[in-house]
Amino acid sequence: MMPLPRGQAIRRDGGLWAFERALARYGLAPVAGVDEAGRGACAGPLVVAACVLPEGRRGQVPDLADSKLLTPTVRERVYEHVVRRALDFRVVAIPAADVDRLGLHVANVVGMRQAVAGLRVRPAYVLTDGFPVPGLGVPGLAMWKGDQVAASVAAASVLAKVTRDRLMCQLGDRYPEYDFASHKGYVTPEHSAALLAHGPCPEHRFSYVNVARAGESSVGCQDGENELVIADTMVRA
């Protein structure tokens, strides 16, 4: 990924729009922000979102922030604002089976590439949260805690998180014994107890140590394939 134009410095405390405004001054607009949800979960999909917000007042989203810093109620409200105001966005869900097959990091990179490639509004620059993503086809910058310092990345984090939470609630209806709606597939005492009691289901990530160990002691639930989450999902209002 390419850095900002030479000699350009941006204060990280300059507000959520500092990076996008600086890039626009160099003709690098529109900007797409990319983030994911579900990296640390041992069940459910890895969800990646790319989002392009309009410049100026049209792109201002009330209460926009890193999705992890928002309550579920506020996050849902911000999600609806982002969907209405975004120039474009794309949400990609990578099923648990593909996370196992590819490995977490590769699955994350693949999801980010798919999300950016699926945008109808082609970005001039891409901001990603955390690590560089090769093969995007446009210049970009990896940002530490990008979802806390760049508006487009924060918007992508909300899209990814809300989409994934909704998918996990659907999986909770399908596999009620795991209570996915409560913990969203992350490791909690309750989730660990359910894994030991019932074994893993097809929506668990078998490459994760705790899931593999639970699978050794129980046959788990085997009713069906990974049907709910598809590998490339367009989510629009």
State what each model feature region is.
Residues 1-237:
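RNase H-like, Mg2+-dependent phosphodiesterase core
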